[in-house]
Regions:
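Basic/polar, cationic surfaces and motifs that engage anionic cell-wall
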Residues: 12-15, 125-202
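Non-catalytic cell-wall polysaccharide-engagement segments
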Residues: 1-22
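Secretory-pathway/luminal and periplasmic proteins that interact with or process carbohydrate-rich
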Residues: 2-7, 89, 163-172
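Active-site-adjacent loop/helix surface patches within enzyme catalytic domains
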Residues: 24-45, 50-153
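N-terminal pre-domains immediately preceding structured catalytic cores
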Residues: 20-46, 179-202
Length: 202
């Protein structure tokens, strides 16, 4: 991936140059309006991701996914890819916008890619998730949660933001395990029995 890594560096430099440039003055046709004046504040930092979206790749191998994510014509990417063996590939700086969510919505968020980190798990969409893979995922989630102060409820799946067109990660994904570790939510399995003399009319 020497050639694609070179393209990555070129694009990052181009975006950095764009961010560093002062905004261009926009001339107003209406002379009654004052032109904008740029005064750079000294109080700022980088915007942080606030969501983590978990996917399955729906492909046959990690290598196939890496190739897919490095072909310009596919227009799809993720920040991280985790192989069945547990090997973790970091493909994009966390502060940059990956193309992993597509059309979707969560609460009032309609541009999920702009506020999230995308994690792809090597899985054909039907098989169980390997323990080595899950261990790598949990380690990564722990780091991301601490580094960016991501709320527990904001670790969700692709199927959550696009339920009518996506179902990943598949039904075998251990959401309960993740919730127990502090990533995502799980329903309360403790149910209280209804008293025998319960009067539903009251």
């Amino acid at each position: 991936y020497t050639s694609t890594n070179k393209v990555y560096k070129q694009k990052v430099k181009a975006y950095a140059k764009e961010i560093a440039a002062l905004p261009k003055e926009i001339p107003f046709s209406d002379s009654a309006l004052l032109p904008p004046y740029w005064v750079g504040t000294t109080n700022f930092n980088l915007r942080k991701p606030t969501f983590v979206i978990i996917h399955h790749t729906a492909q046959n191998s990690c290598d196939q996914t890496l190739k897919t994510f490095t072909l310009p014509r596919t227009s799809v990417s993720a920040h991280y890819v985790i192989c069945k063996s547990g090997v973790l590939h970091h493909m994009l700086n966390d502060y940059l916008r990956a193309w992993h969510g597509g059309v979707g919505k969560w609460g009032n968020q309609t541009d999920i890619n702009s506020v999230s980190i995308g994690i792809e798990l090597d899985n054909n969409g039907f098989e169980p998730f390997d323990s080595l893979q899950m261990n790598s995922l949990l380690s990564l989630l722990d780091r991301l949660k601490k580094q960016y102060a991501i709320p527990t409820a904001n670790f969700i799946g692709h199927g959550d933001i696009a339920p009518t067109r996506k179902n990943d990660p598949n039904y075998r994904f251990p959401w309960k395990l993740l919730a127990e570790k502090g990533f995502g939510l799980w329903y309360d399995e403790n149910r209280e029995a209804v008293p025998a003399d319960f009067n539903h009319i009251q």
